[in-house]
Amino acid sequence: MAPPRCRREKLNSTVAEGGVQAADGQRCQRGLPLLGAVPQAAPYTRNNGMGECRRGHRQGHRAEVHDNRPADKVGQGRWLNSQTRRPCRKEVTSFQFFPFLIFHTGGAEMEPLEIMDEGEGPLVGWCDPDEFREWVRDNKSREMADKTMSAEEAVSNFIKDGMYVASGGFGHVRVSMNIIYEIIRQGVKGLTMAGKTSVHDLDVLMAAGCVEKVEAAYSFGHELRGLSPASRRKVEGGEVKVITEWSNAALQWRFKAAAMGLPFIPARILMGTDTFKKSSAKIIRDPYSGKPVTLIPACFPDVAIIHVHRADKYGNAQIDGILVEDYELARAAKRLIVTTEEIVPTDKIRESPWRTSIPYFLVDAVVEQPFASHPCNMPLLYYFDEEHIAEYLALTRTEEGAKEYFEKYVYGVNDFWEYLEVVGGSKRLEKLRRIEQLRERPVYPWR
């Protein structure tokens, strides 16, 4: 019987009892001579043996033996029998993709990475990146469709009880308070929130009883205004659970990994800290250097809410100033609600395409609402409403006070326009605009 040959590599080999002996000159995928015998596997199984060269490189995907017949790899990891030109009943190679290394298992079991340590927190917000990609393909259209709607419609359509929600912006800067208030007004409950520098937005949702779990990086602190009395009361009372803890960088890199289509991202942070213990990260031994490296799992929120300076009706959105994590967050979330200070013609967007950090095909809803970040800051447009924030912090020291606040500013109004009238109307808003433009000095009640 003629010895089996790989049609692609034309490697010479001889059949020996119990296996295929590597002949002189036979080489691995990196061109190094193979050593020793390659055990012959049972027909059409995934356990085909692989020869190794003196550097440990496997013959693997370059030459395999199926039932004493040669095989070719064609296309994307598919194998054809060289005689019948039909696919084998089982594919014999598999690939495991990681951001820093590709392990080729050649049909044999892959040696597991050495996990040196792992955090105690639950893994939430994670899914298989390939499943996420498939979901996006099936559920998000690239059609240039008009996505404008009201805040009420956006929340009703896309935010449901128990979802994982992430809010863009930074602390008290560029946050979608109109959507936050609408979530409360519609009575959404049981949310898990990503607390990556989420302060006023997260705090208001917690005070209203909408949040059940938090992944915390920087939360509950109102900077010089002090710690949040409402969030502290909710956490200490057990109504809200902080399920994991992260650094700001780590939580943002979770979104980055998701945006890149990766299951995790490696970094040299968190190691040796209590933050790591409270996270769901893992520490492995780097297969290159042998040193420890942290694997930070990706995070795919169910819904992201991002406020921008301008957008067109299709969702092409522009942010003036620092993006923080919003570039990554927009690409990591399954659904994206964009609120904007103004809707502009698409031609206006095209005049400065480098500003368009969020393209239309990522967006599910576009909500136009001037001053939507109030009482927080919108860079270049209006300043923090310190008087209103002080009123909120004072009232939410007690449950009764929190109910009074929400009755006045959320349940007692029909929409955000009415809310803006209640907080002071155009006169108050113009004052905040002048302060942001350095034409008037701010007054800080907490001094």
From Swiss-Prot:
Pfam families referenced in this protein's UniProt entry, alphabetically: CoA_trans
Basic and acidic residues compositional bias, start-end: 61-72
Region (Disordered): 39-76
Domain of life assignment: Archaea
One MF annotation (Gene Ontology) recorded for this entry: CoA-transferase activity
SUPFAM superfamilies from the UniProt entry: NagB/RpiA/CoA transferase-like (SSF100950)
Keyword annotations of the record: Transferase
Family stated for the protein in its record: Belongs to the 3-oxoacid CoA-transferase subunit A family.
Protein name per UniProt: Uncharacterized protein AF_1199
Organism: Archaeoglobus fulgidus (strain ATCC 49558 / DSM 4304 / JCM 9628 / NBRC 100126 / VC-16)
